[in-house]
């Protein structure tokens, strides 16, 4: 780092990777270890090893890095823990897909150990690239503590957690309804289910009454259903207890079509009496709502499907407790055997029609559950699974949020959390796949369950001799189970480690709203169950939950691989050609039929690929877009704007260094031997006001606002105004003035670099290494420098008032130049009329600044009422600003020029307006095109109004 030179051209590619290596080599990311200082810890949500990081990861990780760098510069003992997640189903499916594409083999061509070996190889490759991406993003994580959810220590923690929960009777094995993926042959979580709306039908079927004892002309009930194939598993028909149409039928029986099974008519408040006919067929083994009703009424459950989604030859009947029974007649005609759901439906409707049991069919809007992993329709299936009794864990978790021990940001997500926590069902934690934590359970030949650390441990504990054959549970644990232990297991639990004592509870978790229940709530529940404070009370996993919105593409669509609109952060940092971008987006697609659509959209959005922007521009963009839980529409134009912002900071720093390096900056000289100009005092005041607001906004996690205030200060106050205001002194000042301005330039730049470092770490480190040689700072890295603090003693409000007045005067003069089409190179004569003594003094004292910035020839004062010929008059506070019109100015020519320009703009407005008034265009054009046309119309209308105003001003001259 000794060769730091601020080159003329800002090229992020040349500086970012060397700087990161410098940070790593210096071990600056690790906790400093001084436990007398306050600790601060963030546990990064571990990315899945299913591929690479996308913009959503970059967004959340940038927010985390801003916080950790900020707290590190505050002197806190900081730990940012990183790691990766094994992502059970998703990873196994991905590797199976890759194997099939490369060899034509499926999982069934491998032993379990062989497939697992392939997945570990993929894990190594994927984790390596994810680590590379994190480093390119500038993440200041403690790499020495990088974890994986299936490493040895984490696996031990998972086993320990399972055993402890089982021994407290909080884990059990039972037969319940789950989301079943017939292709993957496993249960999946609700998060892995996508509900899609589609057009379908609703069938109205006659259910004949059996020996009706009621007085009625009807011999049947009409039942409406969208899934007639599940009629084979009906065990009741339910009506609402207050539905007067069916009140007398409650307690009677009907004969189920096809099976001729005698089933009861029951009443239940869950029935919607206004939906269909008000009669609901109950199939507890294949519908979640029916399952709840069935449990409530003690109904038997009939499983009609095999695990691959085909009709069974012999249906399985279970009592309401999930035990096999033969209490119902369950033989069905052979014509239905081994049919899949669609064909079974067609066959059953055909049979009902032949038996004159089909009343009618109506079109109906349906919501069909699909597997996010395979795209197949999810089948509610009755299977043996492992469960956690979560209701026994919820109260502490609810109280922690209710009492604001844990705070949600934004607050509205607190209500979402409560709505889930108050309606919990037992959590299915087993999966029928090979990749994951093996459930530490064994069975003997009598299906007795033994839970322990290993078979040897179980035999010793239960005094089992070698004649007792034990079989290991084949299922693995749900990925969310191990993830829910993340905050404490990654710090060494179940051992009582120093890291656990120092850094737990952690300070903040940053996550998306879609996993508040699947991850956040479960982390809170399990952490508060396992981890206790010194006084024995339950310990929380984190103090704050910061919820981010989703990053959507510029059309507002969710970014996903299937849509082909995911953007790799590295492609934004380094750039990518259109050819390579297309290859990346269409490689290893699970749905290759979408490739043409993806190619067309990509070429339309990025015809020339993506230009390199560097990490700092990406980070600043992400922070600027971080607006309190709202979804983010990615904007390449804003990215380009913030790349320009970094470039402006770079060149402003070069300007400062050119005028301060090897110059007398008065760094070690008494303040009395320096003369600070009005501009110096003003910029110091504005800087400290910015620092004050920065701290306040970061405390409430308004990242978008801290980006905005930094952009405003650096671009407009520091670069546009202060650097210009210093030039008269830098070029014509005396020794004291020069010393004061140079001192302000270099010390303010150094402070400004520290203020912006958490957001744009690379460019600030690069410049700071050069700046520190001027300021005499002996520090090794800006990362460990103190973060700027607000200092009220340097606030000079008079300087703010004076400079704001000067700025307004300059802007008024510049506006006049535009209105009169006078080149900036032509010096102007200006006159102030009716000026107070205070303002006159302000102008006189700062006439050099005014003349320099506004390009003035002279400034004069005249009294109220004095006529000043051939001038343009503009009000400026309580006085009047008169600008002498140059002899070269031709009023008529200028009016004609403005009119011609106005006519041209008007034709453009008419063309666009005609297009927007065309219904065919509105109905057929993409929304993005319509939006662009409307924006262009607004722009031209704004220009037109300005031209009209300028023309009016000209006529008055």
Curated annotation (Swiss-Prot):
Enzyme class: ligase
Enzyme Commission number, as recorded: 6.1.1.9
Keywords: Aminoacyl-tRNA synthetase, ATP-binding, Coiled coil, Cytoplasm, Ligase, Nucleotide-binding, Protein biosynthesis
Keyword Zinc in annotation: no
GO CC field: cytosol
Coiled coil: 889-918
Positions that bind ATP: 561
Record's keyword annotation contains Transmembrane helix: no
Catalytic activity: tRNA(Val) + L-valine + ATP = L-valyl-tRNA(Val) + AMP + diphosphate
One GO BP annotation of this record: valyl-tRNA aminoacylation
Motif placement: 'KMSKS' region: 558-562
GO molecular function: aminoacyl-tRNA deacylase activity; ATP binding; valine-tRNA ligase activity
Chain span(s) of sequence motif 'HIGH' region: 47-57
Domain-related comment: ValRS has two distinct active sites: one for aminoacylation and one for editing. The misactivated threonine is translocated from the active site to the editing site. The C-terminal coiled-coil domain is crucial for aminoacylation activity.
Family classification: Belongs to the class-I aminoacyl-tRNA synthetase family. ValS type 1 subfamily.
HAMAP family given in the database record: Val_tRNA_synth_type1
Job of this protein: Catalyzes the attachment of valine to tRNA(Val). As ValRS can inadvertently accommodate and process structurally similar amino acids such as threonine, to avoid such errors, it has a 'posttransfer' editing activity that hydrolyzes mischarged Thr-tRNA(Val) in a tRNA-dependent manner.
NCBIfam families referenced in this protein's UniProt entry, alphabetically: PRK05729.1, valS
UniProt name for this protein: Valine--tRNA ligase
Species this protein is from: Blochmanniella pennsylvanica (strain BPEN)
């Amino acid at each position: 780092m000794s060769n730091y030179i601020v080159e003329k051209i800002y090229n992020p590619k040349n500086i970012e990777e060397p700087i990161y290596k410098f940070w790593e080599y210096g071990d600056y990311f690790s906790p400093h270890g001084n436990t007398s200082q306050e600790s601060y810890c963030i546990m990064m949500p571990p990315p899945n090893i299913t591929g690479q990081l996308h913009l959503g990861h970059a967004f959340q990780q940038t927010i985390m890095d801003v916080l950790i760098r900020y707290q590190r510069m505050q002197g806190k003992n900081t730990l940012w823990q990183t790691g990766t997640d094994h992502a059970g189903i998703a990873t196994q499916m991905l590797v199976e897909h890759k194997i099939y594409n490369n060899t034509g083999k499926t999982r069934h061509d491998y032993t379990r150990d062989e497939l697992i070996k392939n997945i570990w190889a993929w894990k190594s490759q994927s984790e390596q690239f994810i680590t590379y991406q994190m480093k390119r993003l500038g993440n200041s994580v403690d790499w020495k503590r990088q974890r994986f959810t299936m490493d040895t220590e984490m696996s031990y923690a998972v086993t320990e957690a399972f055993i402890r929960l089982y021994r407290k009777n909080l884990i059990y094995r039972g037969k319940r309804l789950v989301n079943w993926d017939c292709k993957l042959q496993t249960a999946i979580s609700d998060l892995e289910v996508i509900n899609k709306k589609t057009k379908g039908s609703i069938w109205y079927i006659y259910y004949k009454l059996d020996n009706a004892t009621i007085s009625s002309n009807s011999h049947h009930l009409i039942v409406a259903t969208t899934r007639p194939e599940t009629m084979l598993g009906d065990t009741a028909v339910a009506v609402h207890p207050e539905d007067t149409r069916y009140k007398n039928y409650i307690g009677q029986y009907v004969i189920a079509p096809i099976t001729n099974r005698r089933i009861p008519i029951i009443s239940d408040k869950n029935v919607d009496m206004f939906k269909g006919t008000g009669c609901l067929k109950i199939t507890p083994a294949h519908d979640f709502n029916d399952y709840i009703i069935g449990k409530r009424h003690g109904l038997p459950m009939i499983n009609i499907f095999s695990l691959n989604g085909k009709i069974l030859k012999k249906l399985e009947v279970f009592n309401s407790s999930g035990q096999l029974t033969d209490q119902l007649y369950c033989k069905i005609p052979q014509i239905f055997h081994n049919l899949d759901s669609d064909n079974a439906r067609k066959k059953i409707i055909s049979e009902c029609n032949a038996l004159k049991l089909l009343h009618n069919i109506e079109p109906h809007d349906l919501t069909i559950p699909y597997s996010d992993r395979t795209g197949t329709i999810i089948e509610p299936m009755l299977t043996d699974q492992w469960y956690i009794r979560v209701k026994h864990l919820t109260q502490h978790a609810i109280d922690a949020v209710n009492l604001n021990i844990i705070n949600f940001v934004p607050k509205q997500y607190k209500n979402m959390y409560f709505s889930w926590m108050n309606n919990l069902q037992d959590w299915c934690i087993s999966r029928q796949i090979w990749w994951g934590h093996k459930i530490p359970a064994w069975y003997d030949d009598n299906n007795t369950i033994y839970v322990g650390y290993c078979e040897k441990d179980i035999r010793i504990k239960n005094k089992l001799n070698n004649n007792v054959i034990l079989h290991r549970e084949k299922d693995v644990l749900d990925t969310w189970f191990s993830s829910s232990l993340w905050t404490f297991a990654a710090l060494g639990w179940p051992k009582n480690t120093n890291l656990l004592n120092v850094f737990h509870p952690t300070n903040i978790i940053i996550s998306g709203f879609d996993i508040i229940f699947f991850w956040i709530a479960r982390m809170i529940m399990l952490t508060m169950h396992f981890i206790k404070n010194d006084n024995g009370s339950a310990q929380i996993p984190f103090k704050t939950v910061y919820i981010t919105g989703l990053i959507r593409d510029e059309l507002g669509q969710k970014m996903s691989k299937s849509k082909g609109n995911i953007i790799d952060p590295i492609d934004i940092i380094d750039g990518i050609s259109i050819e390579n971008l297309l290859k990346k987006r269409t490689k290893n697609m699970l749905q290759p039929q979408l490739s043409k659509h993806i190619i067309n959209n990509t070429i339309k959005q990025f015809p020339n690929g993506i230009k390199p922007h560097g990490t700092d521009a990406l980070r600043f963009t992400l922070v600027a877009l971080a607006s309190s839980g709202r979804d983010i529409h990615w904007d390449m134009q804003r990215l380009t704007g913030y790349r320009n912002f970094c470039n402006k900071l770079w060149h402003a720093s070069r300007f400062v260094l050119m005028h301060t390096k090897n110059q007398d900056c008065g760094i070690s000289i008494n303040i009395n031997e320096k003369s600070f100009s009005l501009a110096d005092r003003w910029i110091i005041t504005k800087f400290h006001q910015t620092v004050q607001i920065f701290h306040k906004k970061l405390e409430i996690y308004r990242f978008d606002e801290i980006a905005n205030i930094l952009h405003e200060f650096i671009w407009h106050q520091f670069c546009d105004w202060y650097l210009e205001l210093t030039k008269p002194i830098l070029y014509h000042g005396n020794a004291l003035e020069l010393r004061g301005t140079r001192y302000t330039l270099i010390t303010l730049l150094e402070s400004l670099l520290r203020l912006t470092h958490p957001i744009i770490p690379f460019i600030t480190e690069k410049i700071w290494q050069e700046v520190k040689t001027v300021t005499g700072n002996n520090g090794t890295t800006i990362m460990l420098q103190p973060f700027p603090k607000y200092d009220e003693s340097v606030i000079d409000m008079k300087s703010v008032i004076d400079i704001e007045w000067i700025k307004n005067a300059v802007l008024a003069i510049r506006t006049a130049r535009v209105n009169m089409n006078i080149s900036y190179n032509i010096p102007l004569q200006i006159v102030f009329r009716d000026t107070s003594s205070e303002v006159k003094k302000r102008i006189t004292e700062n006439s050099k600044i005014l003349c320099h910035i506004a390009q003035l020839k002279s400034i004069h004062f005249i009294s109220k009422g004095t006529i000043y010929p051939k001038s343009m008059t503009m009000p400026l506070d309580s006085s009047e600003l008169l600008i002498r019109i140059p002899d070269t100015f031709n009023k008529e020519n200028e009016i004609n020029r403005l009119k011609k320009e106005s006519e041209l703009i008007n034709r453009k407005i008419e063309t666009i307006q005609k297009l927007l008034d065309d219904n065919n265009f509105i109905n057929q054009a993409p929304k993005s095109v319509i939006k662009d046309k409307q924006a262009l119309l607004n722009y031209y209308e704004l220009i037109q109004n300005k031209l009209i105003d300028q023309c009016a001003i000209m006529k008055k001259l």
